[in-house]
């Protein structure tokens, strides 16, 4: 199973612990949704515990959360997972790795 398959499977199961298994303790993650759910973060989430808090809040807010992967792009130490969310919105998750773990991530959303 590829990283993106494990990633989407964990998200669709609403299993934050399984998603977090692939993230470094010192991860930095940015997202406009984080800015909305955690205004004090200004959209920048630092560290695995804070990321757990953000994603737990997101799952409480979006009870019907579901992702369908449309495409995956791979670079040297980066992948981009393009997917549709539960609202049929197009999203790209840009994930940079150190070794086997994500050290930096960015949730980006299609601008209408």
Name the predicted role of every residue range.
Residues 1-28:
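Short acidic-aromatic low-complexity motifs
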Residues 7, 19, 27, 47, ...:
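Hydrophobic pocket/interface hotspot
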Residues 18, 24-70:
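A solvent-exposed, acidic/Ser-Thr-rich amphipathic alpha-helical stretch
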Residues 58-112:
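A beta-strand edge to alpha-helix "cap/lid" segment located at domain peripheries
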């Amino acid at each position: 199973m590829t990283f993106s398959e494990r990633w989407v499977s964990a998200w669709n199961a609403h299993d934050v612990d399984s998603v977090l298994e692939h993230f470094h303790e010192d991860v930095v993650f940015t997202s406009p949704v984080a800015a909305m759910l955690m205004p004090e973060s200004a959209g920048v989430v630092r560290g695995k515990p804070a990321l757990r808090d953000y994603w737990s809040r997101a799952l409480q807010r979006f009870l019907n959360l579901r992702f369908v992967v449309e495409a995956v792009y791979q670079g040297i130490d980066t992948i981009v997972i393009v997917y549709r969310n539960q609202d049929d919105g197009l999203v790209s998750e840009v994930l940079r790795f150190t070794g086997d773990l994500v050290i930096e991530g960015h949730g980006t959303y299609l601008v209408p």
